[in-house]
């Protein structure tokens, strides 16, 4: 696996692979990789002949007071994990390489509606930063397909909409969330949790599983079901950001008629913000 730091080197390597008839897969990350990321790379390697991963901690998607400066940078360990997972090329640019004109005047990509509620409400500008950097990376790599984790469900919905609306010829694959044995969704931010907090954190997935089972059993009183789970999460000591039952594609509030449903939660455990979701396809 080669590591390149400039767009010119990236494009040369991808052009060489494509000229050999290879299908290009892409997995964008912010580094500090765990086995969930490795699953995304493995999926790309199954679907493509040449896999590019990127590591870039994108300042545009961090708001004031968020963890940009303390976000872990673990390049050497990440390179080893990518190699083991089947990555062929790592693109690890600097901020200056990604935003050579600075960020103030940078052209932005905005996906309205899908970006506005849920995480978008408490992290204004976040999804604009995500859409902007992903569109830049897509233009740099020009992959045939890209893999994203379903743990960041709203992000996946935003990227699918952007690719559709801007006619990008890229297949987007959503890969199921990888979980610890106790159900906690793997996340780079789990490393911020104390041992005590880590023991509490699986309450989020328990709540999702309970409300999901109730909905599958035919209970469509979403307000009542939500209130029960909110009470359980707050009783465990988390500070809730949101707990919502939404339609699975457009993320509008779900109705009893919907067959494609996603339940999404975000909550703070101490200073650490955790997110999770459960996607349901009803018969």
Swiss-Prot record:
One of its GO terms (biological process) is pantothenate biosynthetic process. PANTHER family: CYTIDYLATE KINASE/PANTOATE-BETA-ALANINE LIGASE, PANTOATE--BETA-ALANINE LIGASE. GO terms for cellular component: cytosol. Pathway: Cofactor biosynthesis; (R)-pantothenate biosynthesis; (R)-pantothenate from (R)-pantoate and beta-alanine: step 1/1. InterPro entries: Cyt_trans-like, Pantoate_ligase, Pantoate_ligase_C, Rossmann-like_a/b/a_fold. Beta-alanine binds at residue 61. Keywords: ATP-binding, Cytoplasm, Ligase, Nucleotide-binding, Pantothenate biosynthesis. ATP binds at residues 30-37, 149-152, 178, 186-189. This is Pantothenate synthetase.
């Amino acid at each position: 696996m080669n590591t390149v730091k400039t767009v010119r080197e990236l494009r040369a390597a991808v052009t060489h692979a494509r000229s050999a008839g290879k299908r290009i897969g892409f997995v964008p990350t912010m580094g500090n990789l765990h086995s969930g990321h490795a699953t995304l790379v493995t999926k790309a390697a199954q679907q493509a002949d040449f896999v590019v991963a990127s590591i870039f901690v994108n300042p545009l998607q961090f708001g004031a007071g968020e963890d940009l400066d303390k976000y872990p940078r673990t390049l050497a360990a990440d390179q080893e994990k990518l190699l083991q997972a089947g990555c062929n090329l790592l693109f690890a640019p600097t901020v200056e390489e990604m935003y050579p004109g600075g960020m103030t005047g940078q052209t932005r990509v905005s996906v309205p509606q899908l970006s506005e509620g849920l995480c978008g409400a408490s992290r204004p500008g976040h999804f604009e930063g995500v859409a902007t950097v992903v569109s830049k990376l897509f233009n740099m790599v020009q992959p045939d397909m890209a893999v994203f984790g379903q743990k960041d469900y709203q992000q996946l919905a935003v990227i699918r909409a952007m690719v559709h609306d801007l006619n990008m010829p890229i297949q987007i694959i959503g890969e199921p969330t990888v979980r610890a044995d106790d159900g906690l969704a793997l996340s780079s931010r789990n490393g911020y949790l104390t041992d005590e907090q880590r023991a509490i954190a699986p309450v989020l997935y328990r709540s999702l599983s309970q409300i999901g089972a109730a909905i599958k059993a035919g209970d469509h009183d979403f307000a009542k079901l939500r209130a029960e789970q909110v009470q359980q999460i707050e009783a465990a000591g988390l500070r809730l950001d949101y707990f919502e039952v939404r339609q699975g594609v457009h993320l509008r509030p779900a109705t009893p008629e919907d067959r494609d449903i996603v339940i999404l939660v975000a909550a703070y455990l101490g200073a650490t913000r955790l997110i999770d979701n459960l996607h349901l396809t009803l018969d």
